[in-house]
Amino acid sequence: MFSCPILRKEKILQELEAERLRRQNLIKEDLQKKYAELQRTGFPLSECIGFIADLGGSNEIAYHYELICEDWERDDPLHFDNSFDKHDLAGIDFLFAAINKASTEKILVFTAYLIAEILVRSKHRDFHTAACNRLVPILVSLTNTKDCVLRRKALIAVGWVGAVQEIGIFNERMLHDEDSLCRAWSASGLWQLSCNRLHSQTILPEVKDVFRQAIAAEKDLFACGVMIESAQSLFGKKWISSIAVENEDAAKIEKARKSAVRFLTKDEI
């Protein structure tokens, strides 16, 4: 009575293994031919999904990265980077080497960001801590870029891979960065630290007064909302909803601001 389900399972496993081997055996010329066909047909979504999987399953790491760099320049990217994590540690090592050869600041920031994206999905891997520690100094230096769009990406990535030493960077940016989204992502970066490499109890004493100052002074409604939402996640409170922040609901944000500042002003929390 169990033979049919067992046979189906075995058949599925065999097909999956055959597909894995097919992708592993793809060479650059195979991928180039497929890419040319995608270009000719206008990059249909269903075909792109299969091609992205082929890129990640192949051993052609350099060609995959070449297409990713081209994709980053598109107004409507195809997200070829979505499967780069399948290259595993070899892919991460390749990206670190690529950072040293980056032709533009944008490529440099986007490459470092891609490494961080992969690492945040690889917390269970043996290489995670060492790779994070290797990446953090690079990202920290990139938070000083004058390009606010690139600075935002660097700050987001620091939140994924940073440690206790990076708390001060977020505190400083949340209070003083000239770009409202950089201030917002600095606040959410502190919360991201607690979701990834740090326990919230390590963060709270270092950020309580900074959150109070930043929330009280913030003029941009969205940034203020993100700060409040980040603080409430860290301190276990509920002052505002994500929808109110996204909608920049002035009345709800101002009400939440008062509650947050009142709470953060307390001597003991």
What are these regions (language model features)?
Residues H64-D75, I107-L119, N144, A184-L190:
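HEAT-repeat alpha-solenoid elements in large eukaryotic scaffold proteins
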